[in-house]
Amino acid sequence: MTTVRSLTTRLQRVPLTRPWAADVTSVGIIATHVVRSDGAEGWGFSWSPQIGAPAVHALLEHDIAPASVGRSAVPGECWQGLWEHLHEAGGGGVTTIALAGLDLALWDAEARSAGTSVSHVLGRRRERVRGYGSGVNLHYSLEELLAQVQRWIDAGFEGVKIKVGKPDLAEDLDRVAAVRALLGPDRALMIDANQRWDLDRATASVDALSRFSLAWIEEPLRADDLAGHAELARRIDVPIALGENLHTVHRFGDFLRAGAAQVVQPNIVRVGGITPFLRIVELAAEHGAALHPHLLPELSGQLALTLPDTAHEVLVEDVEDAGFGALGALADPSPVTIGDGWLTENAHEGLGIRFAPLLTGGRTPADDPLTARKDHS
C-alpha cells in the first residue's frame, strides 16, 4: 500500500490588488507538500482570507502532519479517518479547511504520478465552462460599481454578481436598477447579501429587488440559519444560493433536504478538499439543485470541467483581480485561462497550483521544498 511519508507546510499572506475591505488587504495561504512512500510528490493548499490562517497552519503542522504519516496516500482513503481523528477540534471550519491542504496534495500527487491532470483522473466532461464576473463591491460608489460591471461586459461575461445589503433598501434598489440597465435584459444578474439580513428584511428586500430578473439571492441570512432559509424559500420566488460558509457534507445535506437552497456553492477548500466536494456534487444532483463552486477559479474551474451534466449549467466565479494567477502568487503558469467569458484548462500535471514563496534572506524558489521538485528515489 502506498502511504504518506511526510507532509510539510508553509504559511504566507498574498496581498490583494483590490482590497475586499479596509481590513482585508491580503489572503492567508497555507501551502502544502506531501511525499508518498513511493517517492511521488504532491502540492496543495489551505486558504482562509481574513481569519484563522495561523490556526489552520497549526492544525496541519501539529495534528494532521503526524497523524497522516503511514496512512493510505490514495486520494480519499484517509480523509474520513483523519476527520474523525480531528473531530474533537470541531466537525467543520478550521478542521475541514486544514484537511483540504492534505487532500488536495494527495490528489495532486496521484495525477502527477500518472503524468496527467487531476481533471483527467476524475474524468473531464467538457472542454470549457462559463464564468461570471464577481467582486467585493458593496463599498464601491455607484460610479465605481458600474465601471466594474462594464469591465465584466467587455471581458465577455454573460452573468455578473454584485453585493447588496446597504442600510437603506432604496440604495440597493438604485444600484441594482443601474446595473440591470447597463447589463440589458439578456445577461444574468445575481446578488449577494453576505448574511446581512434577518428573515423579515430579506423577505422585503428580495420582494423589492426581484423586479430586476435576479438569477439568485446569495446568503441572504446568517449562513447556518437552516430554519430561516427554509422559511425564506417558501416566501420568495428568487432561488436561494448558499454554501460558501457550510463546511461539511452533512450540513449541505441538511439544507438540501429542507429545501433551504436551490443553488449550492461549496468552497472546495472549506469543505475539506476534493474528496468531500465530490460527495456534495452527488447530493446536489440527488436533490435537483444547481451547483456552482465558490471562488478559487484555478481550483474550482478544474473541478467544474468534471461535473456531471444536469439541468443546470455549471458556472465558475471569477472575482476581479483576485485569482492566484492574477495576484502573482503561483510558482508556475496558471492551470486555467479565463477569456471571452469562458474558463478553459491549460496543459499541466496534477492541480498545477504551487505557491511561490515570499522570498526573504536571499532564498530562491529552488531552496523551497514547497515549490522545488526533488528526486526521492
Identify the function of each model-found stretch.
Residues 1-29, 47-53, 67, 71-73:
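Motif-centric detector for short Cys/His coordination patterns
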Residues 120-236:
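Metal-dependent enolase-superfamily TIM-barrel catalytic cores that perform enediolate-based chemistry
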Residues 4, 39, 64, 102, ...:
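Conserved, mostly hydrophobic/aromatic
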Residues 207, 213, 224-342, 346:
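Shared catalytic-loop signature of beta/alpha-barrel
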Residues 6, 35-113:
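Metal- or metallocofactor-binding catalytic centers and their adjacent structured scaffolds
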Residues 44, 131-134, 160-162, 187-193, ...:
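Hydrophobic faces of well-ordered beta-strands that scaffold small-molecule active sites
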Residues 57, 61, 65, 103, ...:
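Predominant activation on well-ordered alpha-helical scaffold segments within soluble catalytic domains
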Residues 2-14, 24-27, 37, 294-377:
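Flexible C-terminal active-site loop/helix
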